[in-house]
Amino acid sequence: MESADFYEAEPRPPMSSHLQSPPHAPSSAAFGFPRGAGPSQPPAPPAAPEPLGGICEHETSIDISAYIDPAAFNDEFLADLFQHSRQQEKAKAAAAPAGGGNDFDYPGAPVGPGGAVMPGGTHGPPPGYGCAAAGYLDSRLEPLYERVGAPALRPLVIKQEPREEDEAKQLALAGLFPYQPPPPPPPPNSHPPPAHLAAPHLQFQIAHCGQTTMHLQPGHPTPPPTPVPSPHPAPALGAAGLPGPGGALKGLVATHPDLRAGGGGGGKAKKSVDKNSNEYRVRRERNNIAVRKSRDKAKQRNVETQQKVLELTSDNDRLRKRVEQLSRELDTLRGIFRQLPESSLVKAMGNCA
């Protein structure tokens, strides 16, 4: 096991000595004496700090400046990391009473008039307090940064996101889509404008559409064009309120009354027929003849189907009887071959060969 490296150095001077404040005398509580009862000799001046070059000369140092981006050293560098700890320290300093004595007083020290701590108290500090005073003094040096307004300390800067991008986007959108007042609506019961007056309206719409055109990249799909409203009146509406052939037909019949007797072409209205006329009688006779013919054809097809079924049934019975006859002959031949001896079978096979 290697021993830990300890370095001998003079006691660290208080922070107030670097800010041109009167040097503080070493507290007698650090040596186990009550306050105000120390030796009579004057306090020794603080020792001059040793040059930094003589500290840890035998240790190895690494230069990491090559690995750090120089652009990262700005006023906001590591500000977010120390924000929380400094806020806690400021909150503690603000919570302390205004005349609450000094940072080096122990909690049980009596308080005199005006909030000042009585030096030494009536009975002195508790035993053993002087042994821990040195470590306590070293650990309470941090609040001096807050008590003394040091000019070298920078104020805490909170990083905020830039908002110039939002303003630039708004300006760009305003340049792409300028406000265009809508054209005044036409008065009611107005006739459609003639052809020579409709051209400026169309040019205005084309110009308006050209101003609001979006510039897309080659990879994006092109949106469908916006339909331009026509200045001409809408077509006639049909029976259901929709434009269609029915509405146009009604308008045509209204303008030409002589078309009503003709049935209206493709309309669903039935034609009025006189049942006592010869034409109606001839038509009914032709229809009856066609119906009789279709019925006779259906009956004939039915009779033909029945005859075909009878023929197929008779053929099936005849084939079944033939199969039964052949099966009986086969059984008879098998019985004959079983009764013959094997020698005769061999001779018969030899004669056949």
UniProtKB/Swiss-Prot annotation:
Assembly behavior: Binds DNA as a homodimer and as a heterodimer. Can form stable heterodimers with CEBPB, CEBPD, CEBPE and CEBPG. Interacts with PRDM16. Interacts with UBN1. Interacts with ZNF638; this interaction increases transcriptional activation. Interacts with the complex TFDP2:E2F1; the interaction prevents CEBPA binding to target gene promoters and represses its transcriptional activity. Interacts with RB1. Interacts (when phosphorylated at Ser-190) with CDK2, CDK4, E2F4 and SMARCA2. Interacts with SREBPF1.
Region feature (Required for interaction with TRIB1): 54-72
Gene that this sequence comes from: CEBPA
Modification N6-acetyllysine occurs at: 159
Region (Interaction with FOXO1) residue spans: 240-353
Region (Required to repress E2F1:TFDP1-mediated transcription, to inhibit cell cycle and to induce adipocyte differentiation): 1-70
Region (Required to induce adipocyte differentiation) residue spans: 126-200
Keyword Nucleotidyltransferase found: no
Maturation and modification: Phosphorylation at Ser-190 is required for interaction with CDK2, CDK4 and SWI/SNF complex leading to cell cycle inhibition. Dephosphorylated at Ser-190 by protein phosphatase 2A (PP2A) through PI3K/AKT signaling pathway regulation. Phosphorylation at Thr-222 and Thr-226 by GSK3 is constitutive in adipose tissue and lung. In liver, both Thr-222 and Thr-226 are phosphorylated only during feeding but not during fasting. Phosphorylation of the GSK3 consensus sites selectively decreases transactivation activity on IRE-controlled promoters. Sumoylated, sumoylation blocks the inhibitory effect on cell proliferation by disrupting the interaction with SMARCA2.
Chain spans, region Disordered: 1-56, 176-197, 213-278
DNA-binding region residue numbers: 280-295
Phosphoserine sites (modified residues): 230
Sites bearing Phosphothreonine, chain numbering: 222, 226
Biological function: Transcription factor that coordinates proliferation arrest and the differentiation of myeloid progenitors, adipocytes, hepatocytes, and cells of the lung and the placenta. Binds directly to the consensus DNA sequence 5'-T[TG]NNGNAA[TG]-3' acting as an activator on distinct target genes. During early embryogenesis, plays essential and redundant functions with CEBPB. Essential for the transition from common myeloid progenitors (CMP) to granulocyte/monocyte progenitors (GMP). Critical for the proper development of the liver and the lung.
Record SMART domains: BRLZ
Identification of the protein by name: CCAAT/enhancer-binding protein alpha
